Amino acid sequence: MSLMREIPWESCLLEPRRDPKLERRFRRATGRPIGPVIYYSGTSWLDDTTLWFNVNVAKQVSIDADLVGLIAMIVSQDNSCRFCFAETRALLRILGMPERRISQLEHDLLSEEFDERERAALEFSRRFSRANPPPDKRDFDALRTAGYDELQIIEIASVASILVFFNRVTTIFALPPYSMEKLPDRWYVRLFRPLLAFAVSRAGNTAQIEPLEPDEREGIFSEIVLGLDGLPFARSLRRTLDGMWASTVLARREKALVMAVVSRALGCPLAGKEVGELLLAEGLRGEQIDEILTHLTSPVLTAKEQQIVAFARETVWYEPARIQQLGRNAMQGLSREEFVELVAVASIANMICRLGILAGAA
């Protein structure tokens, strides 16, 4: 496999926007600089989601940080996400993993001599990310045979789903990976590595089980969220979905179309049924919905909706340079805020539909 830094990557689609308040929140919560958020900050629910999901990746209930790092590497590698891979690589270096070991992992993660338990988790995570075909009962049984309990399996899937989200956000926006790729070799990082490692590890303490409150058990895609109940990620996902749906940057019908296109492409009946009901509530008839999802076009779509539908389909599986070029084209007909929300909604859709498939397979 070629090195991640050799993957073609377009120039960044967005100009950075500094937000000192958000930067302070992020640093306090994660122990790290804000990183990519400065490029797409300004959409309230997405700012919050980025912070919550970063904390959820760092703090696990039942699996250890080393496994989380390996899952992050394999999912980012599977999605050809140079930014997330470089970020994970840098964190592993800061936390003390030797460069030689990381380079071996980068060349071929699954050729490494992992024990049966680690390999089962990584195989599952890669199949979850790729979703072509998605994991099925046999994959769950393989995890159980390897010694994982139900909470650990859900947590492995949750970590992989968060990476699916971040991989798309950072790749589609073409966030520049170059400084992150060089970060571990900077003199000041080498000098202060013990302090940086302490700050990062302190922010990644073990999380506690957090059952959802009664009012968090309702809302769009509640059945999928309830399948994660007990993990702090379930609360983050509930709040994310509520914030996304309440946002007025894109119309609800536009967001529902994105969700519907992704659920059809991935074959997620759970999400597909619910999003079909959302589209009916937004004024589309059943035969119109079927026409849109079958042909990705329809006379009932506005020009903007047509653009959104076509773009959403491309986010399911992609090559980085091509999806970045398509993103640049999509920007021409949308405001910055609309484009940022479109990418965020499509990324959430890819996450939620993969989780929805698991709910049916487990």
Mark where each language-model region is.
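Alpha-helical scaffold segments that form or flank carboxylate-/histidine-based iron centers
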Residues: 33-39, 66-79, 110, 150-157, ...
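Short acidic alpha-helix initiation/capping motifs at coil-to-helix transition points
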Residues: 45-50, 80-84, 129-138, 232-238, ...
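Short, thiol/selenol-centered motifs that function as redox-active sites or metal-ligating centers
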Residues: 71-95, 159-163, 255-282, 289-290, ...
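Acidic/His metal-coordination segments adjacent to aromatic residues that form catalytic metal sites
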Residues: 106-115, 294-301
